[in-house]
UniProtKB/Swiss-Prot annotation:
Residues 1-36 are annotated as: Disordered. InterPro entries: FSCA_dom_sf, NIF_FeS_clus_asmbl_NifU_C. GO terms for molecular function: iron ion binding; iron-sulfur cluster binding. The keyword Ligase does not apply. Belongs to the NifU family. May be involved in the formation or repair of [Fe-S] clusters present in iron-sulfur proteins. This is Nitrogen fixation protein NifU 2. The lineage of its organism: Bacteria, Pseudomonadati, Pseudomonadota, Alphaproteobacteria, Rhodobacterales. GO terms for biological process: iron-sulfur cluster assembly; nitrogen fixation. It comes from Rhodobacter capsulatus (Rhodopseudomonas capsulata). Residues 14-23 have a biased composition (Low complexity). Keywords: Nitrogen fixation.
Length: 142
C-alpha cells in the first residue's frame, strides 16, 4: 500500500519565507521525483473496492416464485423456533405479503426489550436466503 500513498504532506517547521506563515503544510516530493499516477491510483482503489464488496447471490440461488418463497420463509422460521423456545418464547409466521413478513412473537419474546434486535436477525437471515430485501414486522394486536 505504501506505493499508493507515496505522496504525503509534511509540516514546514523551518523559517517562513516572507509573506508566508510558519507551520504551513507543504507537499513532500514523491519517491523518485515523479508525481503519482492518479489513474493507476484510482484503478487500484476501484479494484480493492470490488474485491471487498459483497457479491449478490447467484441467479440459481434466488427464490422467485411466491409459493416457493413462502415455503422457504416458513422453513427458515421453523428452523429458528427451537432457539426462541429455549428462552421461553416462540415465533410464528403469520403471513408474507410482497416484501413484508409478518410474525407473531409470544411467551417471553413478546415483551422482551431485545425483540427489535431479534426481528432484525430474522430479517437478515431471510434477506440472505431469499436474495432480496424483505421487512420482518411483528403482529400488532389491537
Amino acid at each position: 500500500m505504501k506505493d499508493l500513498f507515496d505522496e504525503s504532506l509534511t509540516l514546514d517547521t523551518g523559517s517562513a519565507a516572507p509573506g508566508t506563515a510558519p507551520g504551513r503544510p507543504r507537499r513532500r516530493q514523491p519517491a523518485g521525483g515523479k508525481a503519482p499516477d492518479t489513474a493507476a491510483f484510482l484503478a487500484n482503489f476501484v479494484r480493492i473496492g470490488e474485491i471487498a464488496a459483497p457479491k449478490p447471490p447467484a441467479a440459481a440461488d434466488v427464490v422467485s416464485e411466491p409459493e416457493e418463497e413462502a415455503a422457504v420463509v416458513a422453513e427458515l422460521i421453523a428452523e429458528m423456533r427451537p432457539m426462541f423456545q429455549r428462552d421461553g418464547g416462540d415465533i410464528e409466521l403469520i403471513g408474507l405479503t410482497g416484501a413484508t413478513v409478518q410474525v407473531r412473537l409470544s411467551g417471553s419474546c413478546a415483551g422482551c426489550m431485545m425483540s427489535a434486535r431479534t426481528l432484525s436477525t430474522v430479517q437478515h437471515q431471510l434477506i440472505e436466503t431469499l436474495g432480496r430485501p424483505v421487512r420482518v414486522v411483528p403482529e400488532i394486536r389491537h
